[in-house]
Amino acid sequence: MVSLRSIFTSSILAAGLTRAHGSSGKTCPTSEVSPACYANQWETTFPPSDIKITGATWVQDNIYDVTLSYEAESLELENLTELKIIGLNSPTGGTKLVWSLNSKVYDIDNPAKWTTTLRVYTKSSADDCYVEMYPFQIQVDWCEAGASTDGCSAWKWPKSYDYDIGCDNMQDGVSRKHHPVYKWPKKCSSDCGVEPTTSDEPEEPTTSEEPVEPTSSDEEPTTSEEPTTSEEPEEPTTSDEPEEPTTSEEPEEPTTSEEPEEPTTSEEPTTSEEPEEPTSSDEEPTTSDEPEEPTTSDEPEEPTTSEEPTTSEEPEEPTTSSEEPTPSEEPEGPTCPTSEVSPACYADQWETTFPPSDIKITGATWVEDNIYDVTLSYEAESLELENLTELKIIGLNSPTGGTKVVWSLNSGIYDIDNPAKWTTTLRVYTKSSADDCYVEMYPFQIQVDWCEAGASTDGCSAWKWPKSYDYDIGCDNMQDGVSRKHHPVYKWPKKCSSNCGVEPTTSDEPEEPTTSEEPEEPTTSEEPEEPTSSDEEPTTSEEPEEPTTSDEPEEPTTSEEPEEPTTSEEPEEPTTSEEPEEPTTSDEEPGTTEEPLVPTTKTETDVSTTLLTVTDCGTKTCTKSLVITGVTKETVTTHGKTTVITTYCPLPTETVTPTPVTVTSTIYADESVTKTTVYTTGAVEKTVTVGGSSTVVVVHTPLTTAVVQSQSTDEIKTVVTARPSTTTIVRDVCYNSVCSVATIVTGVTEKTITFSTGSITVVPTYVPLVESEEHQRTASTSETRATSVVVPTVVGQSSSASATSSIFPSVTIHEGVANTVKNSMISGAVALLFNALFL
């Protein structure tokens, strides 16, 4: 009987699924794929383009595969850095790369003309006859990040731009986007309004089997045994208790006497609430299903077959739904802690032509599956509210649509009162992280339009930023570990649970007890919680004891003992509140909770070196430089999943000893050398692996200690300074932009330095001359003669010492000049002036 019911049920389900999804994969006629609005390429600063949808194929529900055709003026393929479709409302993600040097995606061979296939969500038209795509964008980047720059200087268009495709920004019946999105018949059916009715009919046949159950239940009340169990109609009011026995092994109850058929029929009254769903369509009970039951002579078989639909999917779904709420009741609608909502990557506002902004996600609440409600916080430099034309969030991957308008003069939406600072709530799809512990938003954009379409123009002329711009939010365009988007998207723990890897084990644990301990669930608090919704259950909570005292104790003795010899004692354990002992007795589950902890391993590599590109930004410009740094990789294996964590860290200083080198630094301005400096610094050679090849890189670093001369260990023994002598030098003397050549007499002395090692160094030094007069008187009987001599003296020596000990009659000062200087105070002053000029 079990196998026959299984075959019967599977045939019913297969037929229902075939009828429900038989038209899946249908392709719409090309002639019926048309623009959803009229759009003209209003942006004249972008290359001319022709972007359209040329085909659509229905997948399931509101999901379609569409063919996108792209034609535009372009450079060569070697100049292309990246080309991608962003802001998609798609089950496969919000971005599709068609060409990327950074990500190594090369799906096209001609950037001027190409096609690609996209899987997208759609929204229904007002008459429910057509479906329409959500808005999206196509982003193009040229001549950057390793792409060839040949021909880029002659390219008259921007190096980076986005084509906007959509019908969500209408003005005077025309979309302000570059191109429109497209629409086509719903499910690619040309009969508008017919398919929905036919789509409901296959659902009713799937439920038409259930009206057979009420008909069979109506027949069974005709049996005298069913009315004897008058309390069971109250039990049908609580569908869960009987259903769980049905999902338990009551198929073995039919193996007992025919009385189990009565509970099986009494269980059909349990499904009599499910016929309430078909009772919405009472036509089917009036259909030819009732005659079919009289044609079937064996009513017990029909209840058994009617049980099978009850246990086919719907009772199992309640049981599974009762199982799922047990773990989901705890996280149902939980809000993630604010501290655990963090950026999914590092992004710097690289675009300096837009107003400075701070856009982030400040909160997340789990709704269901991969759907979350998030709070977006926006702060940016702005004009007044009266100048705002439109402000909206576009490119969302959301069940409510790809665009949310927060302010629009055209659409009459005024949800904010301060364009410089506001918050809003978004319902979005998310994608799981590699370790399945976190979820992350898909990329999106925030579009701002000022001073147009009826907005005030006061102050617009003084606005230094563009009148229309888009903030890009995402982590899908990484370069050197930094996102090239304006701001990052955010991530948070999956289902807002802080126990990564534990929740799946707890979700598995309830499944294990539910399969083995379903009898406990009737006795446990789950069903009493469900009965609490109906006041009859407290009465029926005692009625299960009455059946235990009635003839049905034989059924537990016959059905439960073979199935639940282990659990037959456990119902007594819950009565004795020994549920804590169940985990103690079933050590397998704690074992399963401990097992994920045992295989967790961590392996950390030594510090190696790598090159990073660091971007330093000032007020309006940014510069990039290569920096050598350390990198470590930690491999973590948990539950069989391996995660590699890369950490950049400073290089250990104790392993590097800089070598002093002389460096010439030249500062340029206006293509001319303005200053050249020679200084000593440290140099370190590093072997760096870049792109798989090893390269020796010299990195300049400050010296940890002062540069020590080679004679640092050699002590000076003696210093001998020679007597000053005179010499003549030639200098250019300039005054008031007029230069002339002058001959200057100056002093020169030599210092002979002898070191303890025996080395000798002679250092010549030019010194100015200082005039000193010394009168030597010679006493004689016949004549007194006075002699005046000009003595060259090193600056800094006292005049008295020069007068007494530095008289050198043998030294002559440049013939023809000394005599004049000796006798003329004016000439001496001139000599001092030249000496000063020389200094």
Curated annotation (Swiss-Prot):
Entry's family note: Belongs to the flocculin family. Highly divergent.
Organism: Komagataella phaffii (strain GS115 / ATCC 20864) (Yeast)
UniProt KW rRNA-binding keyword: no
UniProt keyword list: Cell adhesion, Disulfide bond, Glycoprotein, Signal
Domain observations: The Flo11 domain contains aromatic residues that form two hydrophobic bands on the surface of the protein that confer homophilic binding. The hydrophobic bands are lined by stretches of acidic residues that may sensitise the protein to environmental pH.
Official protein name in the record: Flocculation protein FLO11
InterPro entries, per database record: Flo11, Flocculin_t3_rpt
Compositionally biased spans, kind Low complexity: 593-606
Annotated spans, Disordered: 187-342, 496-606
